[in-house]
Amino acid sequence: QAHTYRTLFPAMIKNWRKKWGTEFPFYWVQLANYMAADSLPAESTWAELREAQTMALSLSKTGQALAIDIGNPNDIHPRNKQEVGRRLSLIALHNDYGHTDLVYSGPQFRSMQIEGNKAILSFDHAESGLIAIERYGYLRGFAIAGADGKFVWAKAKIDGDKVVVWSDQIANPVAVRYNWGNNPDGTLYNAEGLPAVPFRTDDWKGITQ
C-alpha cells in the first residue's frame, strides 16, 4: 500500500504533533535495499514506498536518512546501525544544534532538461560536487524511457554539478529513474559521501495505485 502511505505517513506525523501540542522534529530512515536485485528496470513496491517517505519531507522540521546502500538482500534490518545513526545525527546537528555548515543529505533530484537524446539532471545537496563511488568507478542505477514508458538501463556521467543520462536505445527520452527497485545498486553520491536519494522524474501510475 505504498501509494496510500503518501497520505498515512504525513497524517501520522501531524497527528502526533497535535497530540503533543508542539511541532517537534521528526526524522526517519528510508527503507533499505532488500531482496534480489533486478536484472532489468522494473516496477517496485519498495521503490514506491521510498518515494512516499521522501514526499513527507514537504512537512516542516522533518528529515530522512538513507540506508539504500547499506542493506542486506537477505535481512530486512540493516546490520550497519552505526552508519544509519551517523546519518540521522547529521540531520539533527544541522537542524537542531546549530551546525548549519554540515551537509546532512545526499543529492536530491531538482530538475530535468532534455537535450536531444540526453537528459540533464540537476540536484540539491550537491554544492561540493557529485561523485561516483569507487565500487565500480562509474555511475550505475539510472534507467531511461521514452513516451512508451518502457525503461532500459542508461549510461550516465557526471558533468560538473549535473548528471547526463542517455541510452542508444532511446532517441527521445521523457523520463529518468534512479535506484528505482527493491535492491538497487546506484553509485551517485555527493562529495561528503552521502548517497543520492532514489527518484523518478515521471508521475506514471505505479503498481500500488
Region locations from a protein language model:
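Catalytic-domain carbohydrate-binding cleft regions of carbohydrate-active enzymes
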Residues: 1-209
